[in-house]
């Protein structure tokens, strides 16, 4: 183990030695000689052969030569400590290599280098993690999770290679964002435009930025984008973002209001509502999304009704929407969305987008 640990350490400091060698060539020659010896030892270990004991002794003698002269009785315990530290170095190095490989595979298959907490990965797109952010798991649970993540990564490889058809995951009533309805200066998507799917949580800031990016880039004009609102639920049964469940219920209630109507009679309160939440601001300049999250349940409900009135909803519309948001129909829609998200699309974070035959984790970036 001493030989392998020495090779790891020598390999890591190689770049610094290369710089020093410019000024001290003898130092560089001594380093390369030691590195070759260490590599020869590693090669023998790989071939299940014994390392040269003289190299191991050379390493120990270099480290202990002053101790031998001054404190000879310390040599044996210090030699044992060197062996232990060598084992630790090798284990840590192997763990680091495996973790790096796992992170790269996760980034390729799942779109995040951190399977459990996608939002903690700085290499992927911005995303809201599922479930609780805090990690109070003990060492055994963390170790078990480390191995479980390998299974998740390999299980995701077929999904990474498959051709994703967004329309397969639509849930009725399907809400297609009409850019023309949101902004008269924009064009509505053509009937033959490709389909796309946005799986969003109305309280997630990454979802807000993703929606804005799509709106500004013309994505809603070039694609027929279906919106599925999926309020992230915590382990205790509550919701990650305040009032996201309420907003989702109102969203699907307004979608049901247009169900069965001819295109010219549809009111598009659903698209207008999600547009207001993701792009709007209060008179004081606060983002509508964060404003709704700061309200109590009853206050948020009253504010949503005010939004609908702004969109032209009549008293009859408001009564029907209030009835629908508590109905079994909306509960069934949310259950179908949950099933599509967790069991069919197998999301690892929000937003999750499907377009151009691929599944994408994180906010849309043009």
Segments (PLM) and residue ranges:
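Hydrophobic alpha-helical segments
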Residues: 1-53
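Hydrophobic alpha-helical membrane-embedded or membrane-associated segments
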Residues: 8-13, 45, 83-94
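Membrane-interface motif at the C-terminal end of an N-terminal transmembrane signal
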Residues: 21-24, 91-109
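Cytosolic juxtamembrane regulatory segments of multi-pass membrane proteins
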Residues: 45-61, 121-131
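Loop-to-transmembrane boundary segments
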Residues: 58-93
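Extracytoplasmic thiol/disulfide redox context detector
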Residues: 103-245, 326, 330-346
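Structural alpha/beta surface segment adjacent to cysteine/selenocysteine redox centers
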Residues: 208-301, 305, 348
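C-terminal cap of thioredoxin/glutaredoxin-like
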Residues: 298, 302-366
């Amino acid at each position: 183990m001493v030989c392998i640990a020495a090779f790891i350490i020598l390999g890591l400091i190689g770049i610094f030695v290369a710089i020093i060698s410019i000024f001290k060539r003898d130092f560089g020659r001594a380093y390369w000689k030691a590195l070759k010896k260490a590599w020869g030892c590693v090669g023998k270990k790989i071939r299940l052969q014994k390392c040269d004991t003289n190299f191991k002794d050379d390493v120990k003698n270099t480290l202990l030569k002053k101790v031998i002269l001054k404190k000879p009785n310390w040599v044996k315990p210090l030699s044992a400590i060197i062996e232990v530290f060598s084992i630790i170095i090798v284990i840590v190095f192997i763990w680091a290599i495996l973790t790096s490989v796992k992170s790269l595979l996760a980034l390729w298959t799942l779109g995040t280098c951190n399977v459990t907490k996608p939002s903690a990965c700085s290499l992927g797109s911005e995303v809201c993690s599922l479930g609780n952010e805090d990690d109070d798991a003990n060492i055994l649970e963390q170790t078990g999770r480390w191995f479980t993540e390998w299974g998740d990564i390999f299980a995701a490889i077929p999904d990474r290679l498959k051709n994703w058809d967004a329309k397969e995951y639509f849930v009725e009533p399907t809400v297609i964002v009409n850019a023309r309805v949101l902004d008269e200066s924009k064009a509505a998507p053509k009937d033959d435009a490709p389909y796309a799917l946005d799986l969003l949580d109305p309280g997630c800031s990454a979802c807000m930025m993703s929606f804005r990016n799509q709106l500004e880039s013309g994505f809603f004009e070039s694609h027929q984008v279906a919106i599925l609102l999926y309020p992230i639920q915590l382990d205790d049964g509550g919701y990650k973002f305040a009032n996201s469940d309420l907003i989702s219920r109102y969203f699907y209630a307004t979608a049901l209001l247009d169900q069965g109507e001819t295109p010219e009679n549809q009111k598009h309160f659903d698209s207008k509502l999600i547009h207001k939440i993701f792009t709007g601001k209060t008179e004081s300049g606060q983002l509508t999304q964060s404003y709704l999250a700061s309200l109590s349940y009853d206050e948020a409900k009253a504010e949503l009704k005010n939004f609908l009135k702004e969109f032209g909803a009549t008293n009859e519309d408001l009564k029907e929407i209030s009835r629908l948001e508590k109905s079994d129909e909306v509960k069934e829609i949310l259950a179908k969305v949950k099933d599509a998200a967790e069991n069919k699309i197998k999301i690892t974070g929000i937003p999750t987008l499907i377009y151009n035959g691929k599944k994408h984790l994180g906010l849309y970036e043009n």
